[in-house]
Curated annotation (Swiss-Prot):
The gene is Pjvk. Disruption phenotype: Mice display progressive hearing loss caused by hypervulnerability to sound exposure. Cochleas display features of marked oxidative stress and impaired antioxidant defenses, and peroxisomes in hair cells show structural abnormalities after the onset of hearing. Mice with conditional deletion in all sensory hair cells show auditory phenotypes with early-onset profound hearing loss and outer hair cell degeneration. Mice with conditional deletion in outer hair cells show auditory phenotypes with early-onset profound hearing loss. It comes from the Eukaryota. One of its GO terms (biological process) is sensory perception of sound. Pfam families: Gasdermin. Changing residue 343 to S: Abolished interaction with MAP1LC3B and subsequent pexophagy. Keywords: Cell projection, Hearing, Membrane, Peroxisome. Changing residue 312 to S: Does not affect interaction with MAP1LC3B. It is found in: Peroxisome membrane; Cell projection, Cilium. This is Pejvakin. In ear, it is detected in the organ of Corti and the spiral ganglion within the cochlea in the sensory areas of the vestibule (cristae ampullares of the semicircular ducts, and maculae of the saccule and utricle) and in the first 3 relays (cochlear nuclei, superior olivary complex and inferior colliculus) of the afferent auditory pathway. Detected in hair cells of the cochlea and vestibule but not in neurons. In the afferent auditory pathway, it is present in the cell bodies of neurons but not in fiber bundles such as the trapezoid body in the brainstem.
Length: 352
């Protein structure tokens, strides 16, 4: 019942998704500013993370006995009174019975009334805290650090703000059916025993909180992640397997980058060749057919294997061809490989 009321409070207050409802009345005093909680990541089917309280504060996991004197400011937030109906359907009724402990037999809904009154917000002065922890180190021998470090899904967080009640508050739940003229009435007006429940809890009870994640380095230094973009956790040691995987990933990335660069350069080079060829009014194809001019031949017929074209076969991507010219020679080789069109004509146009 308490968890349902705090969830409803957080949903209505909002705060951009930073507020977390306190799950249990018995643990409400463990979500005070500078207290430590463990955030456990779930699988992709459950995007919401689970927060677990701990009996420790930030000072407990730091080396040295110096206290943290960061100031905590407080102010009134709002006056909260809420009444709502919750429908019972399928297996949900069994879950609610276990949660609120009332008899819902024959009922189709329960009415929940939460009276928190004026609630206050207590938050740590972030700038002061960041200055104080600049030279502080984490104690890796602390049991909470050892246990959290061994789990890859656990992230240590520090409570930065809490929302508390200021007076004695009450929660009440009634089971019944929805009426047409009235919002709610009992199934058995003569004997409503077991169909209602109320609890009263003291002032200064925490009902919601927000946290900042901690990122802990191998040398014991740590950062408080003050933005949602920064992620907490532990810096991992570079094992042999991890190092090999990291190097392999970098090699593949670099190789792919080089391939894309070569494709880009090759495409630009070919564009220049084609534009240079087609922009000229005279085609060397006609000239090459005249008597005494250079002839395009198939090099395979002369037992010369195919290879990269001397014009467009440069770079990492070899554009191979079987055609060439025996009347031209390069670097002591008595032939040149040239694509039929347009490399053959462009080569001889430049030679001319």
């Amino acid at each position: 019942m308490f968890a349902a009321a705090t969830k409803s409070f957080v949903k209505q207050v909002g705060d951009g998704g930073r507020l977390v409802p306190v799950p249990s009345l018995s643990e409400a005093d463990k979500y005070q500013p500078l207290s430590l909680v463990v955030k456990k990541k779930r699988c992709f089917l459950f995007p919401r993370c689970k927060f677990t309280s701990t009996p420790f504060t930030l000072k407990d996991i730091l080396l040295g006995d110096r206290e943290i004197s960061a100031g905590i400011s407080s102010y009134q937030l709002l006056n909260y009174e809420d009444e709502s109906d919750v429908s019972l359907y399928g297996r949900r009724s069994n879950h609610i019975v276990n949660d609120v402990g009332i008899n819902v037999t024959g009922s189709d809904s329960i009415a929940v009334k939460a009276s928190f009154g004026v609630v206050t917000k207590h938050e740590v002065e972030v700038s002061t805290l960041l200055k104080e922890i600049t030279a502080r180190k984490i104690n890796f021998d602390h049991s909470l650090i050892r246990q959290s470090r061994s789990s890859r899904k656990a992230v240590l967080c520090v409570v930065m703000e809490s929302i508390r009640t200021t007076r004695q508050c009450s929660l009440s739940v009634h089971a019944g059916i929805r009426g047409e003229a009235m919002r709610f009435h009992f199934m058995d007006e003569q004997n409503p025993k077991g169909r209602e429940k109320a609890i009263v809890f003291p002032a200064h009870t925490t009902i919601a909180f927000s946290v900042f994640e901690l990122f802990i380095y191998l040398d014991g230094a740590f950062d408080i992640c003050v933005t949602s973009v920064s992620k907490g956790g532990f810096e991992r040691e570079e094992t042999t397997t991890f190092a090999m995987f990291y190097r392999l990933r970098n090699i593949l990335f670099e190789r792919n980058r080089r391939v894309m660069d070569a494709i880009s350069r090759s495409q630009l080079y070919l564009d220049d060749l084609f534009s240079d060829f087609y922009d000229k009014p005279l085609s060397m194809t006609d000239i090459s057919l005249k008597e005494g001019t250079h002839i395009r031949v198939n090099l395979l017929n002369h037992n010369i294997p195919k290879g990269p074209c001397i014009l467009c076969g440069m770079g990492n991507l070899k554009r191979e061809t079987v055609y060439g010219c025996f009347q031209c020679s390069v670097d002591g080789v008595k032939y040149v490989r040239l694509h039929a069109v347009p490399c053959f004509d462009i080569w001889h146009k430049r030679m001319k």
